[in-house]
Amino acid sequence: AYYRSGYAPTDFPTTAEWTGRWLVEKSRAIAVPSLAYHLAGCKKIQQVLANPGVVERFIDDAETAARVRECFVGLYPLDNTSQGMQATRMALHEPHKYVVKPQREGGGYNVYGDDIPKLLTSVSEEERKGYILMDLIRAPPFNSVLVRNGEVVVASVVSELGIYGIFVSDGKNVVVNKQGGHLLRTKAADVSEGGVAAGFAVIDSPLLI
């Protein structure tokens, strides 16, 4: 059972959708993704994993856990906890240092810069819990050549490397858990969003050394 949709809260407007999701999960079908893997990709779960001591629950070796943490940027809740209220103040005070992310995938949903205060002051406290705050990653730009709509464009760009993972489990029994390739997305340096499907970025080819 492959989920082409179902990655946004709006995809589950009634209990019928939740019942259907749970029915697939309980069946003998292979769910892609499984409910656990689906949750692991949610922005809120990623934010929780960045909390002190959480990664260490899953990685016993302290040195390895520390190396994993070196890859993290700041991730903060936007709820009504003291940490969430502090993050809200940070975002309102210096919005250009952050990006606000909803529980959605596909590109085009993140909020940047001057739009952050507009969002945070327009949503309710309950709605704000559905977002997280992340430090804005400022990748070093470089010059490259893009082909868009059949036209050759020379531009200052930045790239984002994603690593595919293959994970198959049967309950708590992990059958396969390995790296399965990569995806390099490149976009103009002055563009905030980075989704290929949403038209913000192009698929690139890295030189692997």
Positions of the model-derived regions?
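Domain-scale recognition of functional cores that engage charged ligands
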Residues: 2-208
